[in-house]
C-alpha cells in the first residue's frame, strides 16, 4: 500500500515531461501542478495524523481510495491548467491519507526499522518499473495506471490493523548497573525530537522535490532557454535510460544503509548523507553532460534511500501510535510542493536551472543542520537514542 501511495512521487520526472509534451504546459506550470499534487499528499497526511489513532484505519483507506480514483478519472477528461491544478491537489490529498495510514502501520510493527528497509528495497523495483512503463503511456494511460494500482491496493485492506496497539512516545534503553548487570528502562522522549526529524525531512524533500521534478527537463531545455541549453550536452535518450537504471541504486542504498546503521547508528550516517547529497546536486549548476548526469542521478538515488531509511527509522523508534509516523508523507509532500514551486519561481525570475540546483543543495544542508542540532541535544539527554540503530 505504501508503494502505491508513493507512486506519483516516484513518477514525477516522467509525469512532468508528459504534462509538457502531451498537455502543452510550460516548465513553470509543471512546477505548480507537481507542487499541487504533492502538496495535496501533505495535506492528506496531516489530516490522517489527526485521525489515525482515533478512527478505524480501514474506513480512512476506503475514503482515500474513492477520492484518489475520482480525481484521477476526472483528470482524464480535463486538460486546462487551472482545472488540472485543482484535480491533482485532490488526487494528492486522497493519496496522502492512504500513504500516511500505510506508513503509520509500518511504524507500529515490532521491528519498524526493518519494515521500512524492506519497503524501500521494494521501492527501488517499483521506481524502476514506473520510470520504464509510464513514458510509453498516453496521459490518460498514466492516470489509468494510478487508478488500477489503488484498486489492487484494496486487496490488502483485511490485513490492515484498525487501530494502534501502543500510543506512547517513549524509548526502551539498555542501562548498565554498577555491578556490570544490565536492565531496560522506559524513557519518555521529548516531543521536539520527532518534530525536528519532520522538519529535517521537509528540508530534505525541498531538495528532492525540485531536483526530481526538473532533472529531466533541465537535461532537455526548450529553445527559449538558450543560455542554459548551451551548457547542456546530455542527450534526452541517454537521460531517460539513466533515470531507469539509477533507480536500482536504491537497492544498493538499502543494503549499505543497514550495514552502516548497525555500526554507526542512524544519526551520523544521515548527517554525512545530507552533505553528500548537496554536493552531487550542486555539481550540475554549471551545466549537464552525459558524465555528470550519471554521477549525479546514480548518487542521488543511492543517497535518497539513505535519508529515507534513517529518518523513518528514527521516528519509528520513538512513536508507536502512528501519529508522527503518519506525518512523514506530510513532511515529504510539503517539501515536494515547496521545492518545485521555489524552482518554478527561480525559473520565472530568469535565474535558470543553475539557480535551481544551488537552491536544492542549500535545502539539503538546512536539513543537515536541523538534524545536527537534534543529535547534539540527544547526546546530552538520551545518548542511547542519539546513536540508536
Put a short name on every predicted segment.
Residues 24, 56, 77-82, 265, ...:
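Helix-breaking motifs and short loop linkers at transmembrane-helix boundaries and internal kinks
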Residues 43-79:
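Conserved MFS/SLC helix-loop-helix module at the cytosolic interface between two early adjacent transmembrane helices
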Residues 96-110, 305-319:
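Intracellular juxtamembrane helix-capping segments at the cytosolic ends
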Residues 264-311:
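C-terminal transmembrane helical hairpin of 12-TM major facilitator-type secondary transporters
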Residues 318-353, 360:
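A late C-terminal transmembrane helix in Major Facilitator Superfamily
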